[in-house]
Amino acid sequence: MGRVKPKYIKSLAEKLLETYPDRFTDSFEENKKAVAELAEIPSKTVRNKVAGYITRLIKRRKAQEKAETAA
């Protein structure tokens, strides 16, 4: 089991994903760069957690879409 992410990381990631849906992919490295450009996050750790959560959300959405089309 993984760790639970804090609410501020989840809310920031969801807000960025709603505002800039075309800027993010399922690649953590690309998302990390995009988060650094779009949000002023002074901490590298927080930036990486936000980018990781965005990556996870995108992968989850793609898997869900794939499952819906297969069914």
From Swiss-Prot:
Gene for this chain: rps17e
Domain of life: Archaea
Gene3D superfamilies noted in UniProt: Ribosomal protein S17e-like
Designated name of the protein: Small ribosomal subunit protein eS17
Chain segments annotated as coiled-coil in the UniProt record: none
GO terms under biological process: translation
InterPro entries: Ribosomal_eS17, Ribosomal_eS17_CS, Ribosomal_eS17_sf
Family: Belongs to the eukaryotic ribosomal protein eS17 family.
HAMAP family: Ribosomal_eS17
GO molecular function: structural constituent of ribosome
A GO CC term assigned to this protein in UniProt: cytosol
SUPFAM superfamilies associated with the record: Rps17e-like (SSF116820)
PANTHER family on file: 40S RIBOSOMAL PROTEIN S17
A Pfam family the protein falls into: Ribosomal_S17e
Keywords associated with the record: Ribonucleoprotein, Ribosomal protein
